[in-house]
UniProtKB/Swiss-Prot annotation:
This is UDP-N-acetylglucosamine--N-acetylmuramyl-(pentapeptide) pyrophosphoryl-undecaprenol N-acetylglucosamine transferase. It is found in: Cell inner membrane. GO terms for cellular component: plasma membrane. Its EC number is 2.4.1.227. Belongs to the glycosyltransferase 28 family. MurG subfamily. GO terms for molecular function: UDP-N-acetyl-D-glucosamine:N-acetylmuramoyl-L-alanyl-D-glutamyl-meso-2,6-diaminopimelyl-D-alanyl-D-alanine-diphosphoundecaprenol 4-beta-N-acetylglucosaminlytransferase activity; undecaprenyldiphospho-muramoylpentapeptide beta-N-acetylglucosaminyltransferase activity. It comes from Vibrio campbellii (strain ATCC BAA-1116). Pathway: Cell wall biogenesis; peptidoglycan biosynthesis. It catalyses: di-trans,octa-cis-undecaprenyl diphospho-N-acetyl-alpha-D-muramoyl-L-alanyl-D-glutamyl-meso-2,6-diaminopimeloyl-D-alanyl-D-alanine + UDP-N-acetyl-alpha-D-glucosamine = di-trans,octa-cis-undecaprenyl diphospho-[N-acetyl-alpha-D-glucosaminyl-(1->4)]-N-acetyl-alpha-D-muramoyl-L-alanyl-D-glutamyl-meso-2,6-diaminopimeloyl-D-alanyl-D-alanine + UDP + H(+). One of its GO terms (biological process) is carbohydrate metabolic process. UDP-N-acetyl-alpha-D-glucosamine binds at residues 14-16, 126, 162, 190, 243, 262-267, 287. Gene3D superfamilies: Glycogen Phosphorylase B. Its main location: membrane. Keywords: Cell cycle, Cell division, Cell inner membrane, Cell membrane, Cell shape, Cell wall biogenesis/degradation, Glycosyltransferase, Membrane, Peptidoglycan synthesis, Transferase.
Amino acid sequence: MKKNKRLMVMAGGTGGHVFPGLAVAKQLQEQGWEIRWLGTADRMEADLVPKHGIEIDFIKVKGLRGQGVKRLLAAPFQIINAIMQARAHMKRWQPDAVLGMGGYVSGPGGIAAWMSGIPVVLHEQNAVAGLTNQWLSKIAKKVFQAFPGAFPNAEVVGNPVREDVTQLAAPTERMQERQGPIRILVMGGSQGARILNQTLPEVMAKLGDDYSIRHQAGKGSAEEVNAAYQANGVANADVTEFIHDVAEAYAWADLLVCRSGALTVSEVSAAGVGAIFVPFMHKDRQQALNADHLVDCGAAKMIEQPDLTVESLTQQIQQLDRQALLTMAEQARGAAKLNADRVVAQAIVALTEKR
């Protein structure tokens, strides 16, 4: 017979879904809750979640966007099968609530929870709600959104951000006395970003020794990107596939050049670092909309991908001296919502106390 309250987190695919889920999970673990994860075996959660001491159950589910006719015809059967798999996991473990953080797994998982009478809590990380969360919002007991506009009446709480990022020293304390080369941190998300990998080596060649760079290239790309820096005469580039201590990297940086996925935008703000965002080209401009509020308040610049060239990025970076970067960093920190993980965790506790 179980004693502690139990939460099943449904999240997968990318760091933008998984890391916020881990942040909420940590809040509840500190209150004595047991946490289990629902994910897919072939995405990053399969490796990442167990490293945080959380057991994970898998279901078989894939996205439908861009699939051929054959896959689309088979989709209803695959979705039903995924719902049944999720329901079996929930029946065995008996969670008191489930938290949907996005990714393909959330749809079948949310429906399975609803069918089982388990309260569903949703958090939408992006400024434009994904199709899965649009559906699940109709059956969820509580819906949160990171940015205004994803849902008409949902509470705006920001994105749950890792505690080591929120606890970084203030920008003034970190940056005011810095001297030497301006430090550029390039992050394309956990999967990297090809256009940043291709553009930055040439940009750094133009910028010269007044700048230093650390570059997260993404899985399988570090060797190629490092070779591009070498070919452009940039000998001191620090290139890695994945930055594990992201808080330390933010603390090191004077400027980020990055995509504007939901988690990245929230972490940039929480850390207090100025950024040049290059949004991924979604049809609905999701990433551009994620970053708009930081651009509007002077915390960031944005170059839309069709406008990104070696020249345009070089020019934008050269316009930002240390004082401008410090001002951007302070504006970013001032815009941050730092308690999303606690707010979501408290809502889950309150929901289960009513049962």
